[in-house]
Structures are given as C-alpha cells and as structure tokens.
Amino acid sequence: MWEGRGNGMKVTIKKMGINGEGIGYIDRMPVFVPGALCGEEVEITVTEKNGRFAKGKLVRILRRSPKRVRPICSIQRRCGACPYMVCDYEEQLRFKQEDLRQSLIKYAHVDPRKIEPIRPSEKTLFYRNQCKLPCGMAEGELVNGMYMPNSNIFVPMETCFVHEKDLEIMRKRILKVLNRHQIRAYDWHQKRGLRFLILRGFHGKFQCTLVSGEEEFPSAMIEELLALEGMHSLWQSVQTQKKSAELFGPKMELLGGERYLHLQMGEITLPISPRSFFQLNTQQAVAMYACIAELVGDRNALVVEAYSGIGGISMALCRQAEEVIGIEIVKDAVLNARACARDNGIDNVQFLCADAADKLLYLSKKRSIDVLVVDPPRSGLDEAMLAVILRSKIKKVIYVSCNPSTLSKNLAVLQDRYDVGRILPFDMFPNTAKVETIVELKRR
C-alpha cells in the first residue's frame, strides 16, 4: 500500500487530531491530513512517513462531510490558524468535546459523565481582543500576514476574521501610516525593519507595540500614529534574536501615550501592559472567571492562585473569598497586579513574587489553604508543583487548562490524593482546535 509514495492514495477520515487535522489509517498506521474532516473520504499525497505515523497533503475530497462549509477567509488553508473554519460551529464543538473526552479517558481514566457540555462562544468570528502578526512585503508595501504551518513561507493577509472588527480597522490604519513613512519588513542581514505588529484593544482604546530591529522610528510617524482615534499607547520592542521563543525583546520603550491599557471587568479595572497575559476572548474569560468563583464557593476561604500573572483571576475572586494570595515569578506582572489591587481599593488580595512551587510549599506549612487555583502554561504543572500539591492538605484545587493532553496527564498524578469533581470545558477560540477546561479537584 505504501509503494508509490507521492501518488494519490485514498483514505477515510475516522477522527480528528488535537491540532484540527483529520486522521485516517493505511495498513493500521495513522495518517494525519490537514483540511480533512471526520467521515470524509479523501485523496492524499503522502508527504512524510516514519515507523509510527504518516502525514498527507489533501489533494481532493471524494466524499464530503455534510458538516463542511465554505470558510469566510480566503487564506484559511494556507494560514492554518483556523483549521475548523471549514465545518459548522456545532460540529466544531463536538470535535472539541470529543478531544477532551478521549484525552481524559486515555490518560486519567476519568468518568466521562463528569464532563459537562462545552460552553459555546457567543461570537464565532471577530472575537479576539489582540493580534500578533508578522510583517512582510507585498508589491512594495508593508503588510501583515501569517507563516504557513511548519514553513517560512509568508502569506499576506488582507483581513483576519477572528480579530475584533475595531481591532482590524485600527490595524489597517496603522499599516497605512507605516507605509506612508516607508517602513519596511525586517531584514535579517541589516537587523532593521519591522518584525511584528502587536495590537490589543478594549472599550475602543488600543495599545500598539512595534517589534523591530535596532532603529529609531521617525518622530513624524510616531506623532501620526498617536493621533489615530483610539490610540491609547504606543510601544517599541527591539528583538533581533532569530531563534528566540520570546516575541518581545528585552528592550521595551514607551513611544507615547499611557503605560497601561485598562480593561473593565465588572467592578474591577485591570491595567494591561504589552507583556501582560489576558485571555483573548473577553466574553468567555468573564464567563470562566465567574465559573471559578462559583467553584470556590465558601466566602470565608483562603484562596491561593499560582501562576497569577497580572492577577485577573485573583481580582475576580476578591469578593468571593476572605483572602486571596497570588504567586507569580515575573516581577513586572507582580508590580502590575499590586498596582491593580491598590487602584481598585482591594485590601484582601496580596501578590508575591516567587517560584510558585516553592512559595506554595512554604504557605501550605504556615496556613490552612482552602482553595488553590492553577492556570499553568500549555506544558501543564511540572513535577515540583505536582509534588507540593500532593504533600499539602489543600482542600480543593481548581485547575484551568488550555491543553487537554497535559491536563489529563496531571490529573492522573493528582488523583492519588484528589477526586475529580466537575469538568467544565469552554470554547475560547472558535474555528481553532483549542479548548479551555476548568476542573474541580477535592481532597480525599
């Protein structure tokens, strides 16, 4: 069956992969096919094969899924950021629910009946409050775009349909100004030019960061950008390291405007800096924070939030708990969070700058912690944090995850001392394969 590699081969797609690709089987070997949907029969060209799996390029669809739709985005297939834009929204939710279900069963042996129906996003398009787009050149002009998956091929973008509409309007206005001043895309040899345009918006106000080489932008251009309606702050970040995983460079300069962009969440005002992490779907973030507050429950509780960042979750819990302690290792984020608590007149929340596992171990020996909230990166909780949680006597853990695989593997460890309670998935990123999940764990 594998002879004639590169020629058309027929595959029936049996399920969806964690990155939104279709998975079929040839001689019992899984074949990953981006762009194919569950139930479809497709013709592919095999592009890669090893001892465990193969990858295929979709040539044509022989039998279409009834759930397939025409994507609104003309570069959807080449961009690769929104693999589920080719199927209707109900099917997207079903895929995500099933991905979470299979992962929890496989790694953590969780009773799937505990998984509640995924909370859909009110918006399926135009929902992202931030864009982080690379820059390139097209027909002599500076443009934004995306790189094709697993390549250095730049695909110019006219409109991104998952960014909020006013964010897209502002992005295009910024590009016009940059082109009027003949700003060019980054040149690796000269180490000059613009690498990324980063834009975040709340309540009609915008924070723009230009990630560039070592150069000084024209003062006339800066003045013109700051004069754009809604421009709240303008930053420059110098990043010349080619292989750095960090989007921002070590050098950040405020070119004009206010240092922080402010987000109103109920009665709380959150100051957001360019490096601050905040969920990209504002409405779903508010819904998730409300769910976490509900799970905390007891208004007399001591709550500790590990990896607290700028303190968004901690702030959301300040009126739910008697005392909240946030732990974050990034100093700027801690200073940001402390300023937020001070500006909002909140006196029952404190933020500590420390390694999360080390400080949690110390606190758990000194205090009786009722609830621990963890919202780790995609890599999940490390061994040190898992060990501290298991050794502690924390009554309840609320685990917020953006990765079903690492979540499930962590739960497999934590179930040595904790019982899994409610499992609440949220669709934070419509048209992508990603799913956010909140899991309640109760100490036995």
How should each PLM-predicted stretch be described?
Residues 153-195, 214-242:
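Internal alpha/beta scaffold segment
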Residues 1-75, 350-351, 358:
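Terminal RNA-binding accessory module
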Residues 201-213, 269-273:
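Short, aliphatic-rich beta-strand segments
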Residues 59-71, 78-187:
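Extended interfacial segments that mediate partner engagement and assembly in macromolecular machines
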Residues 2-7, 18, 22, 217-444:
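Rossmann-like S-adenosyl-L-methionine
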Residues 116-123, 194-196, 424-428:
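Short, solvent-exposed loop/turn elements at beta->coil junctions and helix N-caps
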Residues 22-27, 145-148, 337:
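Short, acidic/hydrophobic/Gly-rich beta-strand patch recurrent on exposed beta strands
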